[in-house]
């Protein structure tokens, strides 16, 4: 909840950290040990955005290492590209169920020139592969040959995916 709406009228304040302008990388492993409070409106994420976003979202890509919403026991891993979002070719997201967010979990991606692979507590969740078809690459199927930076944030829902935030609750990730 926002303790002082006189300086900021938003009902909820959220926050996060990002490495933009301080650290980015092209290929490798990124992981974080995370736990969160499961509650209606919860929408935390650990994700990556391109350092050069000159083509705009989603054309330069986005890698969602981990997201969860509301009271779900799921961990989502997703990519956003022109291919998956604008052209609606699909195949951009998977999830793992059965997570107890009262306990810590390790969420990771391993990213190389031809694939991105998601892990939850060391267990492979899924892989997104670079196409071998030139026409698909030209349509933006794989914008992941450039540096990305990391973001870890605690957001709340607006009703679009996660339900609207409970303004009487303190969300923690």
Residue ranges and their predicted role:
Residues 1-173:
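GH16 jelly-roll
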